[in-house]
Regions:
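Feature captures hydrophobic
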Residues: 1-120
Length: 120
């Protein structure tokens, strides 16, 4: 599911510029699998399957794989189009230190939505 995340983010000059002050790792949970996404100055430098429970990011965003599949469709259904819309419906959870997420909210929302096909 994350096959093209790194390439899409790093190829988007406007997105990288917006995240130029972001250097951290966060956990992206897709179903039963957790991935550590490492960002250096707005560019994704690595995405790795978390193999130890002690490895974590600054914050985590988790949802079922079917939720992410819908989120990444070209035109997601209502409540699936945005991570903030998924939270009150119980479709996603966010934990950890939320300060860097909130300070760079549009950047992270765009990073997470970047696997979405743009063609409708």
């Amino acid at each position: 599911m994350l096959d093209n995340l790194k390439e899409r983010v790093n190829a988007d000059a406007a997105l990288v510029r917006r995240g130029r002050w972001v250097s951290l790792s966060f956990l992206l949970g897709i179903g039963n699998e957790d991935y550590i996404v490492t960002i250096d100055e707005g560019r994704i430098s690595g995405i790795a399957l978390r193999n130890l429970a002690t490895i974590s990011g600054v914050f985590s965003i988790r949802a079922a794989s079917t939720t992410w599949e819908e989120h990444w469709r070209p035109m997601p259904k209502r409540d699936y189009h945005d991570i903030w819309s998924m939270l009150p419906k119980g479709l996603a959870t966010i934990d950890g230190d939320l300060l860097p997420l909130i300070q760079n909210l549009q950047y992270f929302k765009d990073v997470i939505a970047s696997p979405r096909d743009r063609e409708v």
